[in-house]
Every structure is written in structure tokens, then in C-alpha cells.
A protein has these predicted regions:
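Conserved N-terminal catalytic/coupling substructures associated with nucleotide/phosphate chemistry
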Residues: 1-196
Length: 196
């Protein structure tokens, strides 16, 4: 999956659909979730991954990777963002998402991108739907943590290591910090970057 973030969205959909199976970075959904709580749980699980790549919920693709389109009503990005704004996240850190529609072989596929973040783990202060406050839900392989469960201690440790840059080599960490110029502050004739 390395380098996938640099491809066009329609090319990403074609590649992931051709795999014919779900994975750590993507999930097929023939239709949008009827229950917003289930959709938000999927988003939180995809935000909590130890890798450094964006994740994708692909709507209009069946479980075997066939592009079939959608028959039922679709969700709007604004509605999803509003629902996330109503959740109570620890540290007020929310997943960043976007929703776009691509056309593959004359069939529309909605793509919900969950952008990679170093600010893991992301979890709730209060119960929501079947999700429990303080529980860390994540994507592991092609499965999400169960509603009433919690990620394993080893997986939670990886998420904290990701937050503190401990899963990268020192060079990767430094290059990563240099890329985010908006986080650099000027003081007199020098610049500094404080970890957030």
C-alpha cells in the first residue's frame, strides 16, 4: 500500500476492488450504513491503525470486490462531520475524513477517506451506540474491534508508539516533522517545532 496516497482516487478504487477482498486499509460496502453509529465506529477503527496510510470505505462494491453501485440513499459528508462533532472524543482529537464520488465503468462509487493521523489512539469520553467510553476500537487486518470489546494491549501499544513517532526510524521521524511547515514556529532568528 505504500505510495497509494499519491494515486488518483479512481485508480485507488480500481486497485482495491480488483483485490476481491477487504484489508487493513479498505472495506467494501454495497450500501451506506443505515445506522450512523455503525458508520462512525468504522471511521474510528480506520483512524486507529499503526500504518501510515489513508484508509477507504468503498460504497457500491460488494463483498467480492464487484462494483455494483448503490440503490439506497447516500450519506453526505456534512452529515457525517456533524455527527462526529456531537461525539465526545478524548483530547478533542477527531478523525479527518472526506467523501467523494468516483465513476468506474459507468457506475458511481462513494469513497469515504479516513486520513492517516499520528494522533492515535482516538477514542470516546462517553458511550455512543454500542461503543463504550474509554475503549479503543481499531482496524486489525480486515476486521474491526467488536462493539463491546477492546483492541489488544499489544495493538494499543502500537497506536501510542505511532503517536510518539516510535514506529519510525529517527530519519523517517525527522523528515516527517520537516514536512509540516505550518507546525513550525519562529522565535527571533530561529525556528522550532513542538510536538503536539
Amino acid at each position: 500500500m505504500n505510495g497509494m496516497n499519491d494515486l488518483s482516487l479512481d485508480r485507488i478504487v480500481e486497485i482495491l476492488a480488483a483485490k476481491g477482498r477487504e484489508g487493513e486499509y479498505w472495506d467494501y460496502k454495497q450500501e451506506w450504513h443505515e445506522n450512523m453509529a455503525d458508520l462512525l465506529k468504522d471511521i474510528i477503527c480506520f483512524a486507529n491503525t499503526p500504518h501510515d496510510a489513508n484508509c477507504y470505505l468503498l460504497f457500491g462494491i460488494d463483498d467480492d470486490g464487484h462494483i455494483v453501485g448503490m440503490q439506497k440513499s447516500r450519506r453526505k459528508q456534512a452529515d457525517i462531520l456533524e455527527a462526529m462533532d456531537n461525539l465526545w472524543f478524548i483530547g478533542d482529537v477527531k478523525p479527518e475524513i472526506s467523501v467523494e464520488t468516483v465513476v468506474i465503468n459507468e457506475t458511481e462509487v462513494d469513497v469515504l477517506t479516513v486520513y492517516d493521523t499520528q494522533k492515535t489512539p482516538i477514542y470516546l469520553k462517553r458511550n455512543y451506540g454500542e461503543m463504550l467510553a474509554g475503549c479503543i476500537y481499531m482496524r486489525n487486518g480486515d476486521k474491526n474491534t467488536p462493539n463491546r470489546g477492546m483492541a489488544s494491549i499489544d495493538d494499543v501499544e502500537k497506536l501510542w508508539k505511532k503517536r510518539f513517532g516510535l514506529l519510525q526510524t529517527p530519519l523517517e521521524y525527522i523528515v516527517g516533522r520537516l514536512q509540516y511547515q505550518t507546525e513550525w514556529k519562529q522565535q527571533d532568528h530561529t525556528y522550532y517545532n513542538m510536538y503536539r
